[in-house]
């Protein structure tokens, strides 16, 4: 039996999958990816609505909702009302992705910080974990998390791209740390060095599809089934067998997303 995996962060709601979404999901399950969380946070709230709709029709898919830090400059009261409504949906298991992206700065940094704090507050209201997008902003992100994230609420640092020291610092904040296909890239040795610094009970894996296809699939549209390649590398760096890594990261995803009975 193929080891079961959980893709903790995917964007299969997007238009990149409109032509073959069912086939993509079938390939994922054939590869052992039995569960996934679809992140409804790209652009306007239609992404959140699509993600929730997808989760409603598939018992092994769940959704999150928020506005990506790239797009918070357009976060209107109308958008916010949609997020508040969807955040309470029973198939929504987290608030995100939210956070800070100082690499692209598509939205002003002050707007990013303000939105991050607001989405953490929304997560507290609905008692669901926060899914964080943090790029080149780890010090500011940790300062916000220390001040605003309630103990026990839960936080995922998705697509971790920080240093080993950053990984250690997030672990000290009791955050879960998720590794994407980037960890398989030749130039990503610092990421691989970070893997053993994350407590095993806080490790997650993801595709972030359709982006960041892992080796040996680079250059192709990423899809959930490709998480097997990320799992192989993370298992090696964590000192686990593939089967142990699959079981551990699946248990971790079920715990942080509060899906223990799923």
Predicted regions and their residues:
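Mid-domain alpha/beta scaffold segments of enzyme catalytic cores
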Residues: 1-262
């Amino acid at each position: 039996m193929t080891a079961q995996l959980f893709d903790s962060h995917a964007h299969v709601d997007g238009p990149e999958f409109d032509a073959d979404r069912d086939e993509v999901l079938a390939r994922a399950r054939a590869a052992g990816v039995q569960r996934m969380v679809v992140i409804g946070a790209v652009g306007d709230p239609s992404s959140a609505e699509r993600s929730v709709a997808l989760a409603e029709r598939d018992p092994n898919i769940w959704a999150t909702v928020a506005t990506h830090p790239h797009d918070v400059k357009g976060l209107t009261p109308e958008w916010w009302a949609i997020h508040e409504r969807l955040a309470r949906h029973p198939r929504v298991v987290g608030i995100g992705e939210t956070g800070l992206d100082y690499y692209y700065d598509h939205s002003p940094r002050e707007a990013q910080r303000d939105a991050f704090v607001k989405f953490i507050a929304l997560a507290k209201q609905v008692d669901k974990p926060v899914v964080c997008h943090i790029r080149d902003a780890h010090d500011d992100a940790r300062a916000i998390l220390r001040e605003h994230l309630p103990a026990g609420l839960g936080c995922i640092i998705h697509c971790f791209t920080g240093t080993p020291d950053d990984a250690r610092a997030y672990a000290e904040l009791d955050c879960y740390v998720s590794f994407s296909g980037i960890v398989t890239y030749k130039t990503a040795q610092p990421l691989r060095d970070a893997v053993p610094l994350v407590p095993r009970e806080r490790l997650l894996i993801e595709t972030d599809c359709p982006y960041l296809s892992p080796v040996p699939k680079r250059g192709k549209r990423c899809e959930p089934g490709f998480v097997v390649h990320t799992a192989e590398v993370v298992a090696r760096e964590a000192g686990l067998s593939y089967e142990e890594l699959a079981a551990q990261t699946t248990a971790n995803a079920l715990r942080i997303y509060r899906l223990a009975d799923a």
